């Protein structure tokens, strides 16, 4: 089974109050899992990576063998594809964690989309931020 993992993260202020959200869907659109979490004060990029790490962990837990990660973070997608280097020391640990999880899963692809194509994960992030 191939699944799509929609991830998002956001910070109000950069850094500022931050949260992430993810939605894991089966190929037919059935939601396998979704989650959002406030992570305190962080940058937008830390929030984006936190959502990716949490979503990959859930995919492993559910034994999903193949995942397409869908994100509106061009930086994160290009870093995970190896197109951009991770220059920020603050992101390096999260990048390494995401990379280890992706290798554990096996087949992971990354696709960058516009925010409008990532609405559900974005909504989860904003709900988590509004609740604080």
Question: What residues fall within each predicted segment?
Answer:
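Generic structural signal for short, solvent-exposed loop/turn connectors between secondary structure elements
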Residues: 1, 131-132
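RNase H catalytic domain
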Residues: 10-14, 53-131
């Amino acid at each position: 089974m191939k699944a799509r993992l929609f991830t998002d993260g956001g910070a109000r202020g950069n850094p500022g109050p931050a949260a992430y959200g993810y939605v894991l869907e089966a190929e037919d659109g059935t939601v396998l899992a979704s989650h959002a979490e406030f992570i305190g004060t962080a940058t937008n990029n830390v929030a984006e990576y936190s959502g990716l790490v949490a979503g990959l962990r859930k995919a492993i837990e559910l034994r999903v063998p193949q995942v397409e990660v869908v994100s509106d973070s061009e930086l994160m997608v290009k870093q995970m594809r190896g197109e951009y280097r991770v220059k920020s020391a603050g992101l390096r640990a999260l990048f390494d964690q995401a990379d280890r999880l992706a290798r554990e899963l096996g087949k992971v692809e990354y696709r960058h989309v516009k925010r409008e194509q990532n609405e559900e994960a974005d909504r989860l992030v904003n709900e988590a931020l509004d609740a604080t």
